């Protein structure tokens, strides 16, 4: 059975997609996918071709039609949101992508080798009519096995990298997500995370393979755009901690259907206060997952495990092997903190060439993937992540865990979002606390509360902002933010 075979075998009258008041049946979804498949075929895009996909604005349904059509015709495809993501997707030689399918405003300064293809779907009308193609079923099912996905890492270092998911790797990643579709065709999935992320890509396909409905969640990738009604319709939410916090803080009441709803939270640490708030207002079950674009899911479990350790992410899953090692690669005893390394049955072997081989060789080594995390593996197999190597910083000779500070900041009343950043100032390294809050950031009580969170005699500065920028996976791009903060601090010093 192919990846898309179960989708096309579903009851044509069953609901596949819900966007506001619009209901799209499986019959319509499949017709739209085939219409775009033929439209691309007629323009020379097929098995082995490379296709970048970017749809701006409230076009979540059509984004999915485009991705499914790319798989249908056997194309190698990538989800594009900027030139920053386009460059690694094209590869060092620029030969990974041949065409760029977009709706809305196109990216500027496209490489000459990339052929732009534009469609402008309006509303939810049948795509065959909108494209002016004859409605007909795709008659080349054998092409699908050539499909591949160019998956981009989250870019938490400020520099995204690309991996090639073969057809088999795609199938494995989607099967992992499928194990969470426990209600089968009765599931109503609301994926509150961007399509360009690993989870945002695989969960909807897994839901459709099970005959379930996918709920459109917003006009962008900002959790604040999610309607109360959309969440209430859902039985399964896939969400980042940042978006979860935003939704909870913006809602004045609990969500109906609470007892039949499960939340899967991934991408970062889940503070116990956030977990408890989610259990009170959103769902009866909160699960945490740990994994990466490079390896797929590595571990998972009930968020209650965070009572044992704030960074608990569950137990190994899907044939994953997890080790905690020292700097020389020697395995450490259970319960001892060290460097996390991972091996999974369908992990990628390397990034697509991008001229940064040193980074690649340090992350993929001797059949292991080193995600850059520090963690503990307990005797019973529980994995706890203490933070990324880059998130444990040295300020004034004292090592400080930024995630630990952030978790404690979010426990303070009136703090909607927060992050801690090390800024390399010309005089000395600085610990900068960035807050989204209605509080006066110069208030003495706030300074005293934060002072108790950091090591004694560690100086810090507080910067207040309207929002903390995060990527599609809900992660803060620390290097980018640190540079912006440095510029701000230097300007303040210059201005006096």
Give the predicted meaning of each segment.
Residues 8, 12-13, 131-152, 159, ...:
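Conserved pre-ATP/AMP-binding loop-to-beta segment of ANL
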Residues 13-44, 52-59, 66-68, 85-87, ...:
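Conserved AMP-binding/adenylate-forming core of the ANL superfamily
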Residues 25-27, 148-175:
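Conserved AMP-binding A3 loop
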Residues 171-188, 196-236, 250:
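Conserved AMP-binding/adenylation subdomain of ANL enzymes
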Residues 235-238, 248-308, 321:
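Gly/Ser/Thr-rich phosphate-binding loop
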Residues 309, 323-343, 379-380, 439-443, ...:
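Conserved beta-loop-beta connector loops within the AMP-binding
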Residues 315-319, 330-362, 398-400:
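Conserved ATP/PPi-binding loop(s) of AMP-dependent carboxylate-activating enzymes
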Residues 344, 350, 374-457, 469:
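AMP-binding/adenylate-forming catalytic core of the ANL superfamily
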